[in-house]
A protein has these predicted regions:
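Residues that mark the start of a beta-strand
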Residues: 171-175, 195, 243, 286, ...
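Glycine-rich phosphate/pyrophosphate-binding beta-alpha loops
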Residues: 34, 290-295, 331-339
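A glycine-centered loop/beta-turn motif at secondary-structure junctions
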Residues: 319-356
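Catalytic beta-strand/loop cores that center a nucleophilic Ser/Cys/Thr
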Residues: 283-325
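Proline-centered loop/turn at the N-terminus of a beta-strand
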Residues: 106, 173, 243-245, 261, ...
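Beta-strand-turn-beta hairpins that frame and shape the catalytic cleft
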Residues: 168-174, 281-284, 322-327
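RNA-binding accessory domains that recognize and position tRNA/RNA substrates
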Residues: 1-206, 210-211, 225, 337, ...
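Cysteine-nucleophile active-site neighborhood
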Residues: 215, 220-286, 294, 339-353
Length: 357
Protein backbone atom coordinates (compact mmCIF):
# COMPACT_ATOMS: atom_id res chain seq x y z
CA UNK A 1 0.00 0.00 0.00
CA UNK A 2 1.16 3.51 -0.75
CA UNK A 3 2.09 5.67 2.21
CA UNK A 4 3.82 8.91 3.04
CA UNK A 5 6.06 10.65 5.52
CA UNK A 6 4.70 14.07 6.44
CA UNK A 7 7.00 16.45 8.32
CA UNK A 8 5.66 19.13 10.66
CA UNK A 9 6.61 21.88 8.20
CA UNK A 10 4.23 20.34 5.65
CA UNK A 11 6.78 18.66 3.38
CA UNK A 12 5.72 15.18 2.27
CA UNK A 13 7.56 12.14 0.86
CA UNK A 14 5.82 9.14 -0.68
CA UNK A 15 6.70 5.47 -0.55
CA UNK A 16 5.34 1.99 0.13
CA UNK A 17 4.11 0.90 3.57
CA UNK A 18 5.26 -2.53 4.69
CA UNK A 19 2.08 -2.76 6.78
CA UNK A 20 -0.77 -0.87 5.15
CA UNK A 21 -2.41 -0.16 8.51
CA UNK A 22 0.74 1.22 10.13
CA UNK A 23 0.83 4.79 11.39
CA UNK A 24 3.25 6.49 13.73
CA UNK A 25 4.64 9.80 14.94
CA UNK A 26 8.15 10.71 16.10
CA UNK A 27 11.16 12.96 15.61
CA UNK A 28 12.52 12.35 12.10
CA UNK A 29 16.30 11.89 12.02
CA UNK A 30 18.82 10.30 9.67
CA UNK A 31 21.91 8.13 10.00
CA UNK A 32 24.69 7.93 7.43
CA UNK A 33 25.87 4.45 8.40
CA UNK A 34 25.96 2.10 5.41
CA UNK A 35 25.48 -1.15 7.32
CA UNK A 36 24.36 -2.09 10.82
CA UNK A 37 20.67 -1.40 10.26
CA UNK A 38 19.65 -3.99 12.88
CA UNK A 39 22.02 -2.45 15.42
CA UNK A 40 20.54 0.96 14.67
CA UNK A 41 16.95 -0.27 14.96
CA UNK A 42 17.69 -1.78 18.37
CA UNK A 43 19.90 1.04 19.69
CA UNK A 44 17.90 2.59 22.57
CA UNK A 45 19.39 5.99 21.70
CA UNK A 46 16.91 6.08 18.78
CA UNK A 47 13.93 5.71 21.12
CA UNK A 48 11.06 8.01 20.12
CA UNK A 49 12.46 8.69 16.65
CA UNK A 50 11.60 7.86 13.05
CA UNK A 51 14.91 6.71 11.61
CA UNK A 52 15.88 7.44 8.01
CA UNK A 53 18.75 5.45 6.48
CA UNK A 54 20.69 7.43 3.87
CA UNK A 55 22.21 4.32 2.26
CA UNK A 56 19.98 3.32 -0.70
CA UNK A 57 19.73 -0.47 -0.19
CA UNK A 58 18.75 -1.88 3.20
CA UNK A 59 18.19 -5.48 4.30
CA UNK A 60 20.55 -7.30 1.94
CA UNK A 61 22.21 -9.41 4.66
CA UNK A 62 19.13 -10.13 6.78
CA UNK A 63 19.02 -10.07 10.58
CA UNK A 64 20.28 -12.25 13.42
CA UNK A 65 19.87 -12.34 17.20
CA UNK A 66 23.61 -11.72 17.73
CA UNK A 67 23.29 -8.20 16.28
CA UNK A 68 20.57 -7.07 18.70
CA UNK A 69 21.70 -4.12 20.83
CA UNK A 70 18.75 -4.28 23.23
CA UNK A 71 15.71 -6.40 23.96
CA UNK A 72 13.69 -4.95 21.05
CA UNK A 73 13.62 -2.12 18.48
CA UNK A 74 12.91 1.26 20.10
CA UNK A 75 12.49 3.33 16.92
CA UNK A 76 9.00 4.68 16.20
CA UNK A 77 9.39 4.24 12.46
CA UNK A 78 11.83 3.29 9.70
CA UNK A 79 12.25 5.18 6.41
CA UNK A 80 14.45 3.65 3.70
CA UNK A 81 15.10 3.49 -0.02
CA UNK A 82 15.09 -0.01 -1.47
CA UNK A 83 14.01 -2.82 0.88
CA UNK A 84 15.77 -6.07 0.00
CA UNK A 85 13.40 -9.06 0.02
CA UNK A 86 16.04 -11.71 -0.73
CA UNK A 87 18.88 -11.41 1.83
CA UNK A 88 22.01 -13.48 1.40
CA UNK A 89 24.40 -13.95 4.31
CA UNK A 90 25.60 -17.01 6.21
CA UNK A 91 24.70 -15.42 9.56
CA UNK A 92 21.17 -14.41 8.55
CA UNK A 93 18.35 -15.93 10.60
CA UNK A 94 15.43 -13.98 9.16
CA UNK A 95 14.83 -11.26 6.61
CA UNK A 96 14.59 -7.61 7.59
CA UNK A 97 10.98 -7.70 6.34
CA UNK A 98 10.14 -10.47 8.83
CA UNK A 99 12.05 -8.68 11.61
CA UNK A 100 10.17 -5.42 11.08
CA UNK A 101 6.82 -7.20 10.78
CA UNK A 102 7.29 -9.33 13.90
CA UNK A 103 8.42 -6.32 15.94
CA UNK A 104 5.63 -4.10 14.56
CA UNK A 105 8.01 -1.40 13.32
CA UNK A 106 6.22 0.91 10.85
CA UNK A 107 8.35 0.95 7.70
CA UNK A 108 8.05 3.23 4.68
CA UNK A 109 10.26 2.11 1.79
CA UNK A 110 10.93 3.15 -1.81
CA UNK A 111 11.34 6.67 -0.43
CA UNK A 112 13.67 9.32 -1.84
CA UNK A 113 15.76 9.29 1.33
CA UNK A 114 18.30 11.64 -0.23
CA UNK A 115 15.58 14.29 -0.47
CA UNK A 116 14.47 13.62 3.12
CA UNK A 117 18.04 13.92 4.38
CA UNK A 118 18.77 17.11 2.47
CA UNK A 119 15.60 18.68 3.86
CA UNK A 120 16.43 17.73 7.45
CA UNK A 121 19.97 19.03 7.03
CA UNK A 122 18.61 22.36 5.84
CA UNK A 123 15.60 22.72 8.14
CA UNK A 124 16.70 20.61 11.12
CA UNK A 125 15.29 17.48 12.75
CA UNK A 126 11.56 17.77 13.26
CA UNK A 127 8.44 15.88 14.16
CA UNK A 128 6.86 13.74 11.46
CA UNK A 129 4.20 11.12 10.86
CA UNK A 130 4.01 8.01 8.70
CA UNK A 131 0.51 7.26 7.36
CA UNK A 132 -1.16 5.43 4.49
CA UNK A 133 -2.37 7.40 1.49
CA UNK A 134 -6.01 6.97 2.44
CA UNK A 135 -5.69 8.38 5.94
CA UNK A 136 -8.26 11.08 6.68
CA UNK A 137 -6.92 14.62 7.27
CA UNK A 138 -8.47 14.74 10.76
CA UNK A 139 -6.66 11.53 11.71
CA UNK A 140 -3.36 12.91 10.39
CA UNK A 141 -3.88 16.13 12.35
CA UNK A 142 -4.59 14.18 15.55
CA UNK A 143 -1.43 12.12 15.05
CA UNK A 144 0.64 15.25 14.41
CA UNK A 145 -0.73 16.82 17.61
CA UNK A 146 0.34 13.85 19.73
CA UNK A 147 2.86 14.86 22.38
CA UNK A 148 6.05 12.83 22.30
CA UNK A 149 7.29 11.35 25.61
CA UNK A 150 10.11 13.27 27.30
CA UNK A 151 11.64 10.86 29.83
CA UNK A 152 12.85 8.39 27.25
CA UNK A 153 15.47 7.00 29.62
CA UNK A 154 12.73 5.49 31.80
CA UNK A 155 11.41 3.65 28.73
CA UNK A 156 14.69 1.97 27.80
CA UNK A 157 16.62 1.34 31.03
CA UNK A 158 16.89 -2.12 32.54
CA UNK A 159 14.05 -2.81 35.00
CA UNK A 160 16.34 -4.73 37.35
CA UNK A 161 19.97 -5.13 38.37
CA UNK A 162 22.02 -7.81 36.62
CA UNK A 163 25.67 -8.85 36.72
CA UNK A 164 28.10 -9.79 33.94
CA UNK A 165 30.85 -11.93 35.47
CA UNK A 166 34.39 -12.49 34.22
CA UNK A 167 36.91 -15.29 34.72
CA UNK A 168 39.84 -12.89 34.82
CA UNK A 169 41.65 -12.69 38.14
CA UNK A 170 41.88 -9.31 39.88
CA UNK A 171 39.29 -7.95 37.45
CA UNK A 172 37.93 -4.48 38.17
CA UNK A 173 34.30 -4.19 39.23
CA UNK A 174 32.38 -1.57 37.23
CA UNK A 175 28.96 -0.20 38.16
CA UNK A 176 27.22 0.68 34.89
CA UNK A 177 24.22 2.99 34.98
CA UNK A 178 21.95 1.97 32.12
CA UNK A 179 20.42 5.02 30.44
CA UNK A 180 19.81 2.95 27.29
CA UNK A 181 23.08 1.09 26.97
CA UNK A 182 23.89 -0.95 23.87
CA UNK A 183 24.70 -4.61 24.43
CA UNK A 184 27.95 -4.33 22.46
CA UNK A 185 29.31 -1.70 24.85
CA UNK A 186 28.80 -3.93 27.87
CA UNK A 187 30.16 -6.96 26.02
CA UNK A 188 33.32 -5.09 25.05
CA UNK A 189 33.94 -3.90 28.62
CA UNK A 190 33.29 -7.41 29.91
CA UNK A 191 35.57 -8.94 27.27
CA UNK A 192 38.38 -6.62 28.35
CA UNK A 193 38.21 -8.30 31.74
CA UNK A 194 35.77 -6.56 34.05
CA UNK A 195 32.89 -7.64 36.23
CA UNK A 196 29.94 -5.36 35.47
CA UNK A 197 26.93 -4.67 37.66
CA UNK A 198 24.31 -3.07 35.40
CA UNK A 199 21.94 -0.78 37.28
CA UNK A 200 18.64 0.94 36.40
CA UNK A 201 19.06 4.59 35.41
CA UNK A 202 17.42 5.99 38.54
CA UNK A 203 19.58 4.06 41.01
CA UNK A 204 20.68 6.37 43.83
CA UNK A 205 24.29 7.36 44.41
CA UNK A 206 24.14 5.64 47.80
CA UNK A 207 23.13 2.33 46.19
CA UNK A 208 25.85 2.62 43.55
CA UNK A 209 28.59 3.43 46.06
CA UNK A 210 27.39 0.65 48.38
CA UNK A 211 28.61 -1.81 45.74
CA UNK A 212 32.13 -0.39 46.25
CA UNK A 213 32.92 -0.55 42.52
CA UNK A 214 36.35 0.27 41.13
CA UNK A 215 34.72 2.58 38.60
CA UNK A 216 31.38 3.95 37.45
CA UNK A 217 30.26 3.89 33.83
CA UNK A 218 27.56 6.28 32.57
CA UNK A 219 26.06 4.86 29.39
CA UNK A 220 24.56 6.17 26.19
CA UNK A 221 20.84 6.77 25.94
CA UNK A 222 18.06 8.75 24.26
CA UNK A 223 16.54 12.18 24.70
CA UNK A 224 17.35 15.56 26.17
CA UNK A 225 19.75 15.35 29.15
CA UNK A 226 17.91 18.23 30.79
CA UNK A 227 14.80 16.05 31.07
CA UNK A 228 16.42 13.89 33.78
CA UNK A 229 17.60 16.30 36.52
CA UNK A 230 17.22 13.57 39.15
CA UNK A 231 20.01 11.58 37.49
CA UNK A 232 22.23 14.67 37.30
CA UNK A 233 21.79 15.15 41.06
CA UNK A 234 22.91 11.57 41.75
CA UNK A 235 25.98 11.97 39.53
CA UNK A 236 26.94 15.04 41.56
CA UNK A 237 26.88 12.89 44.71
CA UNK A 238 29.16 10.27 43.13
CA UNK A 239 31.75 12.73 41.79
CA UNK A 240 35.07 12.34 43.56
CA UNK A 241 34.10 9.04 45.18
CA UNK A 242 35.08 6.74 42.30
CA UNK A 243 36.56 7.07 38.78
CA UNK A 244 33.78 7.88 36.30
CA UNK A 245 33.64 7.36 32.52
CA UNK A 246 30.65 8.68 30.56
CA UNK A 247 29.71 8.26 26.92
CA UNK A 248 27.04 9.93 24.77
CA UNK A 249 24.14 10.81 27.11
CA UNK A 250 26.41 9.97 30.06
CA UNK A 251 28.87 12.57 28.76
CA UNK A 252 26.14 15.22 28.61
CA UNK A 253 24.86 14.37 32.10
CA UNK A 254 28.39 14.68 33.51
CA UNK A 255 28.69 18.13 31.95
CA UNK A 256 25.40 19.20 33.52
CA UNK A 257 26.51 17.80 36.88
CA UNK A 258 29.50 20.17 36.89
CA UNK A 259 27.56 23.26 35.87
CA UNK A 260 27.87 23.24 32.08
CA UNK A 261 24.92 23.47 29.70
CA UNK A 262 23.69 21.43 26.75
CA UNK A 263 21.76 22.43 23.64
CA UNK A 264 19.78 20.75 20.87
CA UNK A 265 21.72 20.43 17.61
CA UNK A 266 20.18 21.26 14.25
CA UNK A 267 20.22 17.67 12.99
CA UNK A 268 22.69 15.89 15.25
CA UNK A 269 25.45 13.40 14.56
CA UNK A 270 24.24 9.93 13.58
CA UNK A 271 26.46 7.51 11.70
CA UNK A 272 29.71 5.58 11.77
CA UNK A 273 31.97 8.11 10.07
CA UNK A 274 32.31 11.17 12.31
CA UNK A 275 35.93 12.47 12.53
CA UNK A 276 36.98 13.45 16.06
CA UNK A 277 40.23 15.18 17.00
CA UNK A 278 41.94 14.13 20.23
CA UNK A 279 43.48 17.43 21.33
CA UNK A 280 45.98 15.79 23.70
CA UNK A 281 47.27 13.31 21.11
CA UNK A 282 46.82 15.72 18.18
CA UNK A 283 45.31 12.82 16.24
CA UNK A 284 42.02 12.30 14.41
CA UNK A 285 39.93 9.18 14.97
CA UNK A 286 36.79 8.10 13.13
CA UNK A 287 33.90 7.52 15.50
CA UNK A 288 30.37 6.11 15.64
CA UNK A 289 27.84 8.62 16.95
CA UNK A 290 24.14 8.86 17.69
CA UNK A 291 23.08 12.06 19.44
CA UNK A 292 20.98 15.16 18.89
CA UNK A 293 22.29 17.21 21.83
CA UNK A 294 25.75 18.55 22.64
CA UNK A 295 27.64 20.36 25.39
CA UNK A 296 27.84 24.14 24.99
CA UNK A 297 31.58 24.99 24.96
CA UNK A 298 30.98 28.55 26.23
CA UNK A 299 29.25 27.15 29.33
CA UNK A 300 32.40 25.27 30.37
CA UNK A 301 34.07 28.49 31.50
CA UNK A 302 34.24 28.49 35.29
CA UNK A 303 33.69 24.72 35.54
CA UNK A 304 36.38 22.15 36.40
CA UNK A 305 35.99 20.54 32.97
CA UNK A 306 38.29 20.95 29.97
CA UNK A 307 37.68 19.96 26.36
CA UNK A 308 39.75 16.97 25.20
CA UNK A 309 38.08 16.13 21.88
CA UNK A 310 36.33 18.16 19.17
CA UNK A 311 34.42 17.25 16.02
CA UNK A 312 36.44 17.98 12.89
CA UNK A 313 33.33 18.78 10.83
CA UNK A 314 31.65 21.35 13.07
CA UNK A 315 34.00 21.87 16.05
CA UNK A 316 31.40 20.67 18.58
CA UNK A 317 32.55 19.28 21.93
CA UNK A 318 33.32 15.55 21.71
CA UNK A 319 35.21 14.91 24.95
CA UNK A 320 35.74 16.33 28.44
CA UNK A 321 38.04 15.67 31.38
CA UNK A 322 37.93 16.92 34.97
CA UNK A 323 40.97 18.96 35.93
CA UNK A 324 41.54 17.23 39.28
CA UNK A 325 39.21 14.22 39.65
CA UNK A 326 39.42 10.87 37.78
CA UNK A 327 36.47 11.72 35.56
CA UNK A 328 36.27 11.90 31.77
CA UNK A 329 33.73 11.47 29.01
CA UNK A 330 33.21 11.37 25.24
CA UNK A 331 30.19 12.21 23.11
CA UNK A 332 30.52 9.15 20.88
CA UNK A 333 30.40 5.34 21.18
CA UNK A 334 33.96 3.96 21.58
CA UNK A 335 33.02 0.41 20.60
CA UNK A 336 30.94 1.40 17.52
CA UNK A 337 28.49 -1.40 16.49
CA UNK A 338 28.08 -0.37 13.80
CA UNK A 339 31.20 1.60 12.96
CA UNK A 340 34.98 1.71 13.47
CA UNK A 341 36.90 0.71 16.59
CA UNK A 342 39.47 3.53 16.53
CA UNK A 343 38.51 4.60 20.04
CA UNK A 344 38.85 1.43 22.09
CA UNK A 345 41.87 3.08 23.74
CA UNK A 346 39.40 5.02 25.90
CA UNK A 347 38.65 1.86 27.84
CA UNK A 348 42.40 1.55 28.55
CA UNK A 349 42.28 5.06 30.00
CA UNK A 350 39.35 4.05 32.20
CA UNK A 351 41.28 0.99 33.40
CA UNK A 352 44.26 3.20 34.26
CA UNK A 353 42.06 5.53 36.32
CA UNK A 354 40.57 2.58 38.20
CA UNK A 355 44.11 1.44 39.04
CA UNK A 356 44.99 4.91 40.26
CA UNK A 357 47.48 5.53 37.48
Amino acid sequence: MRGKLILEDGSSYTGELLDGNAKTVGEVVFTTTMTGYQESLTDPSFCGQILTMTYPLIGNYGTAAKFMQSRRPFVRGFVIGELCDAPNNWQSEKSLIDFLTQNKVPCLYNVDTRAVTRHIRAAGSMKGVIVSDGTEPDEIAALQAEELPRDLVAMVTTPEVYVMETDQEDAPHIAALDFGVKRSILENINRLGAKITVLPAYTSAEEVLALNPDGIFLSNGPGDPQDVPEIVAEIQKMAGKKPIFGICLGHQLLALAFGAKTYKMKFGHRGGNQPVKNLRMNRVHISAQNHGYAVDPASLEGTPLVITHTNVNDDTVEGLRHTSLPIFSVQYHPEAAPGPDDNMYLFDEFWALMKGE
